[in-house]
Amino acid sequence: STRVRSSAASDVYKRQVAVGGKTAMEKSKKALLEGIKGSDIEIIDFVWYGGDSSYENVEKIKNNPSVQKADMVFGIGGGRAVDTAKTYCALYNKPLFTFPTIASNCASCTSLSVMYNPDGTFKEYSYHKAPAIHTFINTKIIAESPEKLMWAGIGDALSKEYEVIFACREKNMIHTPLLGKAIASASTEPLISFGKKALEDCKNNVPTEAIEQVALDIIITAGLVSNFTVHENNPNPEEDYYYNSSLAHCVYYGASLFPQCERQHLHGEIVSFGVLCLLTYDGQFEERNRIFEFNRSIGLPCTLGEIALTPDDVPAIAHKAASVVEWKYVPGNPTEDAFINAILATDKAGKEFLADK
C-alpha cells in the first residue's frame, strides 16, 4: 500500500510536491492521495521531471514555483525520474520520499544518481549524502507497469552479485563494503527462481508473490548493496571505494555511445549482456553458461547483434569503459585489449549457444 503516516513525513513537512514521469504520476495519483488522507500533508502540485536525469532538468525543477514552495518532494516513477528528483533534493537540501512505479532498477533506494548529457549520453554519477528517507513500493502499481520494464530490471539486477564480488576481489575490505558484498550474494537466485513467473504475472497485471520477490530484489536488495559498496567524495580520496558495479556496466556505458543501441534497447537489457562479458573476462564459463540459459529463457540478449551492436563497435566500447570509475576497481591489471577479447568471445559463445537451441 501507499500509506504515508510516518512522523518524518506528516509532523515536520506539510507541503509536498510530486516530481516524476507523466505516466507514473497518472498511475499513482489515486494511491498517493488515498495514502495522505487524514494526514496534514498536502500535495500542492505534480511536476514533470523533464524526460531525462540531467542537470539541466534539475535546474528547471529548481525554478518551478511549486517546487520552491514545497517542504518535501515525492520522487515518482522510474530510474531517471527518481534520479532527477534525488539530485535536486541533494543539491538544494529538500527531504525526499520515493515511489517507484516500475521494478526496472534500484534508483529509488540508492544514494547516487546516474546523470546524462542533454543528448542522452552518460555524463557522470552524482553522489549524495544519503538515500531517500523512505521508499514506498506498491506491488499493484508495479504489476500494472509494462512487462518489458520489469524484464529490463531483472537484467540490471542480474549484474549485482557478479559485479560486486568481482570488484571486491584483491581489496582491503572494511566493514561497510563487506556487508554490501554479503547482501549482494543474495541477489541472483531470486531472479532465477521467480523472474520468469513474475514476468508472466506482470503481463497479466496480477500482483503476486513472484512480483513482490522480484521487485524487492531489484529495488531494495540492489539498492542496499549500492549504498554499502560506494564511498565517494570523501575528504580523504584514498579512502574512497566503488564496488557497486563493474564490467557489466562498463559494457553499457560504452554501448551508450551508439544511438542504435542506446535508443532501441533498455539499460538492464544491455547490462545483462555485460554480465556475460564479465563472466567471460573472469573465466567463469560454467556460470556464464547458466546465465546464457537464463537469459534465453526470458529473452535477454546473449549476443552483440541482439542489442544492435557489431564486433566493429567493440573497441570503442572498451575505450569508453577504461574511462569510467568502475575500471579503476577491476581486479588485476585490466587492459582494453583484454576487455575487447572478452566481449568478442562472449558474442561468439552466445551465437554458438543460440545455434544449438
Roles of regions detected by a PLM:
Residues 27-97, 197-211:
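N-terminal small/polar loop signature for handling phosphorylated ligands or for N-terminal nucleophile
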Residues 90-187:
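A glycine/threonine-rich phosphate-anchoring loop and its flanking beta-alpha core
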Residues 37-41, 66, 120, 140-144, ...:
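Generic secondary-structure signature for well-ordered alpha-helical cores
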Residues 2-9, 13:
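Single conserved hydrophobic/aromatic residue that forms the stacking wall/gate
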Residues 284-357:
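C-terminal charged capping/lid subdomain of soluble metabolic enzymes
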Residues 173-294:
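Active-site segments that bind and position negatively charged phosphate/pyrophosphate groups
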Residues 14-32:
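Generic N-terminal targeting/processing segments that precede catalytic cores or assembly contacts
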